[in-house]
Amino acid sequence: FREKYPDIEFHYREYPDLPVEQLFAGNEGNVAFSIGEFDEHLYQVVPLETFPIGLLVNEKHPLAQKESVTIEDLQGEPMFIESSQFHIYHLITERCEEAGFEPDIIFQTSGFSLCHKMVKANKGISVAVDFVFDDMREDGLKLIPFSDGNYEWKACMLTRRDEEENEGVQCFRKHVQEWLQKIRSGEIIR
């Protein structure tokens, strides 16, 4: 983006999902990226892509024999998961509560890499987004789809409805959408 639009001032900061939303609601920044559903009365929401979430297990774990899993399969299993600052944590814990149990979360982290390491060591299970699993793929790990509902990571770009988009924001939106189209067409790899 900076190469294509050198005259547009661009600053980028990365935070977990919930702090991004809190900062953006407090008028920090012009554009935000986050995961989940958003109030479309407050924000112009551009859905970017939706990714399936699966259960991450060591291939030696008994659940690795399954072709698909349900949320009930997590009951009693030690789990490593991204912290409560991320939507994936709330999706999984809410589904567990709806199924009538509390997940056995033994560690909350700020990233998927520790979850993958602990599952590789067969210390427990985790959940992961398909593209993260593909990026971090290692022998001995298996990502199993959920069969009891929609488990998705919906990435969105947000701007505020009550603000007129300046030229920089418009150019950035176009750049992001063109970049995603190139990924979808196979022209570039994520």
Task: Go through each PLM region and give its residues.
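Short helix-loop capping/hinge motifs at secondary-structure junctions, enriched
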Residues: K60-T70, G149-Y151, D162-G168
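Beta->alpha turn/N-cap motifs
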Residues: P16-D17, F33-F38, N58-E59, G111, ...
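Secondary-structure junction motif
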Residues: P78-A99, E165-R173, L180-I189
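A local structural motif
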Residues: K4-Y12, E97-I106, L141
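Beta-alpha-beta core module
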Residues: H41-P52, S113-D162
